[in-house]
From Swiss-Prot:
Tissue localization of expression: Expressed in roots, leaves and panicles. Expressed in seeds.
Provenance organism: Oryza sativa subsp. japonica (Rice)
Main location class: nucleus
Top-level taxonomy: Eukaryota, Viridiplantae, Streptophyta, Embryophyta, Tracheophyta
Result after altering S44D: Reduces transactivation activity 4-fold
Protein name (record): bZIP transcription factor ABI5 homolog
Length: 388
C-alpha cells in the first residue's frame, strides 16, 4: 500500500517537469526513489509542516500560535542545531549522493540538508505572535500569491497544492510560512532545485559550483510584497528568483567546501549560495567578498571631503590675514617709536644749546663786573686837608 502511494506521488511530480526528466526517472530507477526521496525531504527542518514541528518541539498544552516570532525562530534554530550535531546532516548528504548517481535528480532534496545561516527578524515582526502573522497573510490580496503558488509545488508535500481550498496553518511548511511572512527573501530548498531542473535539467550537487545555474533573489516574495515579473514569461515572477549562469571558476581555485559533505571537497549547494547572497555576500572564485559601496555613499564621501578641504583653506586664509595684520601693526608701532626717538633727540639738543648759551652769557656778565670793580680802585681821590 505504501509503495502504491509513493508511486502516485511520483507520477504527480512527473507531471510538473519536462518530458526529458520523465524519461530519465522511469524504468528500474523508480524503485530507488521510492525509498530515498522521502528521507531526503524529511531530513530538512524547512520541509516539515508546522503541525509536525509543533508535535516534536512544543511542550504539551502549548502551540506555536501563542508564541511570538522571536521564540518561534529560536525553537526552530535550536532544533536544527541539535540535528546538525547528531550527524543527521551528513547522513542525509550521503543519501542525496546515492539518489543523484542512480537517477540524476538528487539535488531536489540535497540542496537544503545543510544548516542554513540564521537571519534577523524585522523589528515590527518580533513582538507579533504566529497567529497574528498568519492572520495578516490571509488578509493580504489573494492575487499577489496566486501565480507563485500555481507555478510550484509546496516543498515536502509530494505534489502540487490544491488551489480550490485554503491551506491551514498546520498544513503549511516552515519554508512557505517564513517566505510569506517576509522573514526571508526566497526559498531555501525546493525552489532553487526546481529552478535548475526547469532550465537545464537535473544538476549534480558536485557540479553546481562549476557549470550549474545559480539562483539569485531579485526582490521580496511573499503575500504582502509581490514581484512584478522576472522577464522569463512568468507574470508574477518565478518566486522572485532569476536564473543566471555562474562564471567559470579560475584555474587552481578551490571550490567552496560544503559543511555537510562526507569528503570535505563537495561543491557549495544552492541553499548555501542563497544564504550568502541574502546576507549581502558575493561568491567569486570560491571566496566570499563584500559588495562594493553604492554610488550614493561614494558621492557623499567625496562631497564631505570637498567641504573639509574648503573649510581648511578658509581657515588657513584667515590665519594668514591675522598674521599679516599683526605684522603691519608692529611695523606701524616701530615707525612711530623711531619718529618719537628722533623728536626727543632734537629736543635734547635744543635744550643743551640753550643751557650752553645761558652759561656763556652769565660768564660774560661776571667778567664785566669784575673789570668794573678793578677800574674803580685805581682812581685818585680828592684830598680836602689842604687848600690851594
Amino acid at each position: 500500500m505504501a509503495s502504491e502511494m509513493s508511486k502516485n506521488v511520483k507520477v504527480t511530480d512527473d507531471q510538473e517537469v519536462t518530458s526529458q526528466e520523465r524519461d530519465q526517472s522511469g524504468g528500474t530507477k523508480v524503485g530507488g526513489e521510492e525509498e530515498i526521496a522521502p528521507l531526503a525531504r524529511q531530513s530538512s527542518i524547512l520541509s516539515l509542516t508546522l503541525e509536525e514541528l509543533q508535535n516534536s518541539l512544543c511542550e504539551p498544552g502549548r502551540n506555536f500560535g501563542s508564541m511570538n516570532m522571536d521564540e518561534f525562530v529560536a525553537n526552530i534554530w535550536n532544533a536544527e542545531e541539535f540535528q546538525a550535531t547528531t550527524g543527521g546532516c551528513k547522513g542525509a548528504m550521503e543519501e542525496a549522493k546515492v539518489v543523484d548517481s542512480g537517477s540524476g535528480s538528487g539535488d531536489a532534496g540535497g540542496s537544503g540538508l545543510c544548516r542554513q545561516g540564521s537571519f534577523s527578524l524585522p523589528l515590527p515582526l518580533c513582538q507579533k505572535t504566529v497567529e497574528e502573522v498568519w492572520t495578516e497573510i490571509n488578509q493580504a490580496p489573494a492575487h499577489t500569491s496566486a501565480p507563485a503558488s500555481a507555478l510550484q509545488p509546496h516543498a515536502g508535500s509530494g505534489g502540487v497544492a490544491a488551489n480550490d481550498r485554503q491551506v491551514t496553518l498546520g498544513e503549511m511548511t516552515l519554508e512557505d510560512f517564513l517566505v510569506k511572512a517576509g522573514v526571508v527573501r526566497g526559498s531555501f530548498t525546493g525552489q532553487a532545485a526546481m529552478g535548475s531542473g526547469m532550465v537545464n535539467g537535473p544538476v549534480n550537487p558536485m557540479q553546481q559550483g562549476q557549470g550549474g545555474p545559480m539562483m539569485f533573489p531579485v526582490g521580496p516574495v511573499n503575500a504582502m510584497y509581490p514581484v512584478m515579473g522576472d522577464g522569463m514569461g512568468y507574470p508574477g515572477g518565478y518566486n522572485g528568483m532569476a536564473i543566471v549562469p555562474p562564471p567559470p571558476p579560475a584555474q587552481g581555485a578551490m571550490v567552496v567546501v560544503s559543511p555537510g559533505s562526507s569528503d570535505g571537497m563537495s561543491a557549495m549547494t544552492h541553499a548555501d549560495m542563497m544564504n550568502c547572497i541574502g546576507n549581502g555576500m558575493m561568491i567569486e572564485n570560491g571566496t566570499r567578498k563584500r559588495p562594493h559601496r553604492e554610488d550614493g555613499c561614494a558621492e557623499k564621501t567625496v562631497e564631505r571631503r570637498q567641504r573639509r578641504m574648503i573649510k581648511n583653506r578658509e581657515s588657513a586664509a584667515r590665519s594668514r590675514a591675522r598674521k599679516q595684520a599683526y605684522t603691519v601693526e608692529l611695523e606701524a608701532e616701530l615707525n612711530y617709536l623711531k619718529q618719537e626717538n628722533a623728536r626727543l633727540k632734537e629736543a635734547e639738543k635744543t635744550v643743551l644749546l640753550t643751557k650752553k648759551q645761558m652759561l656763556v652769557e652769565k660768564m660774560m656778565e661776571q667778567s664785566k663786573e669784575k673789570m668794573n670793580a678793578n677800574r674803580g680802585g685805581s682812581q685818585l681821590r680828592r684830598s680836602g686837608s689842604c687848600m690851594w
